Design a protein with these regions (language model features):
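Extended beta-strand/beta-hairpin segments
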Residues: 1-44, 52-145
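Alpha-helical metal-binding/catalytic segments enriched in His/Glu/Asp
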Residues: 49
Length: 145
């Protein structure tokens, strides 16, 4: 379960597996710009997943990872206010065997985050009565108004 909290302003924290992931909106959108936006983290999750698959590919074959890099670029569709294309580029490590190039691309394309975009899960939303807020939570909520 991922739990969301509101530390102030437009910042939103998400707690997962003992970690707290901080997010904020850019200053241009009224936020403080103190952390990546949730959408930035969405793109980061794709890039990090692809990077993990590239790293694992090399390690499983005993290949050097020196110089291995993965980068992600997003092409926007301003008319629909969304991303139209995501490009993932892999800088192969030094001495990477040409015979593995296509296999590396296939491996990286199996990223589980990307696969969830290709076949998205169903979303369900619900709303329930709020639990009793602590005095600190009330104070924080009132100061944000």
């Amino acid at each position: 379960m991922i739990e969301v909290s509101y530390p102030g302003g437009l910042a939103v924290n998400a707690a997962v597996n003992g970690f707290t992931i901080r997010t904020d909106q850019p200053e241009a959108a009224g936020g403080g710009g103190t952390a990546p936006s949730p959408f930035d983290l969405f793109l980061v999750s794709i890039a990090a997943c692809a990077g993990y698959y590239a790293l694992r590919f090399c390690r499983e074959r005993g290949l050097s990872t020196l110089g291995l890099r993965v980068s992600l670029g997003a092409e926007r569709d301003d008319a629909h206010k969304k991303i139209a294309r995501i490009r993932i580029a892999i800088d192969l490590p030094e001495g990477f065997p040409e015979r593995y190039r296509a296999a590396m691309l296939r491996s990286v394309s199996q990223c589980s985050v990307k696969r969830h975009l290709e076949e998205p899960p169903a979303f369900e939303f619900s709303a329930r009565a709020a639990a009793v807020a602590t005095s600190a939570e009330r104070e924080l909520a009132l100061s944000a108004v």
